[in-house]
Amino acid sequence: MKNGLAIWHYPHRSVLENVAFFAEQGFDSVSILGYHMDPICADEQQSAELARLINEKGIVLTVHHKLPLDHSEESVSSFKATVDRFAAWQRKYKSIDILSFDVLEPIRDCITPYIDYVLEKVPFSKIALEDFGLTERERQQIEHLKSNERFGYLIDIGHMHIRMHGKRHEGETLMINSPDECPATEQPTAEDFLRAFRSKEFPIFEIHLHSNDGITDLHYFLDDGVLDVKMIADVLKEIDYRGILTIESAPGCMFRCAYPESDKRILKTYEIWKQCIGK
C-alpha cells in the first residue's frame, strides 16, 4: 500500500512546491486536484517539472477531478476538453497512476458516456469513480466495465463512515446508508467495514481517508472526530489492500486551521497513520 496526501488543501505553497515538500516528508504518493492539474498540462515548463519531480522523488501521482457538473452541452464540452488535456499530458509523460472522478448528483442517473470517454482518451492510467455504484441502478451503468482492468473504485472511508451511521439522507447520495455495504449502526465495527469493502464488485484502486463526527463530512485530521483509525488500518491489512491510501484531511474547509498549524497537523496525522499501519 502506498501512503499519499491530497495536496490541494495546503494552498500556501504552489502545486509543484507541495509535491516536493510532501515527498520530502515521506509520503509515497501525492494527489493533485484536476482543476490544478489542468493549467499545469497547458504549461510545458510546469509539465516537465512535475514529471521530473515524480520521477526524481520516486512517488506515485494521482489526479482527482469531477465528471461533468450536469448534462448540459457546456458542462460536457468543458469536461471533455479537460480530459483531452490530461490525455495529451499522459501520452507524453505517462506519470498519472490513477485518474479519479467525483460524481455529482445531477449526473448520477447516467454517467456511462462520460466514463467511457475517459477510458477511451486517457492511456496508461487506472480510471476510478469515487463512491459510485452504491445502488443497483448505479451499478448497472458500469456493469459493462467489469472486464476492463483499468477501471475501478476510489472509496472514501470518511463518507463510508457517515453512511454506516445512517444519519444523513434527503438528496445527499454519497451519505445515504447503503444496505449493500452495511446496515446503519450507531458505532460501525471492523466487521462492518470488512463487509463494506468485500461488497464492492470492482477493484479498489484508491482510498480517501479522513475523520468526522459520523454525521457531517468534516474532513478532520485523524486525531479528531470519532473514526477508529487503528481499526481502519487493521481492516485494510485484513483485506490485503495494495492500492493507494490518500489522506484527505482538509484544514480550513469545515474547520479552522491555517498555515503553519495546518502543516504541523497534517504531519502529525501522517505519523498517526504510519503508527496504525505499522510502517
Model-derived segments and their meaning:
Residues 19-23, 43-57, 85-88, 137-146, ...:
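Short amphipathic alpha-helices and their capping/turn segments at secondary-structure boundaries
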Residues 22, 48-50, 80-81, 145-147, ...:
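Short, hinge-like loop/turn segments at secondary-structure boundaries
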Residues 2-7, 30-32, 61-66, 97-101, ...:
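Hydrophobic faces of well-ordered beta-strands that scaffold small-molecule active sites
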Residues 7-16, 33-46, 68-78, 105-111, ...:
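Acidic-and-aromatic substrate-binding clefts and catalytic sites of carbohydrate-active enzymes
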Residues 30, 116-226:
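Acidic/histidine-rich catalytic cores of soluble enzymes
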Residues 251-279:
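Aromatic-rich peripheral "rim/lid" segments of glycoside hydrolase catalytic domains that contact
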Residues 53-61, 65, 69-155, 161-162, ...:
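Active-site acidic/histidine proton-transfer and metal-coordination neighborhood
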Residues 1-84, 151-154, 179-183, 188, ...:
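N-terminal pre-domain/capping segments
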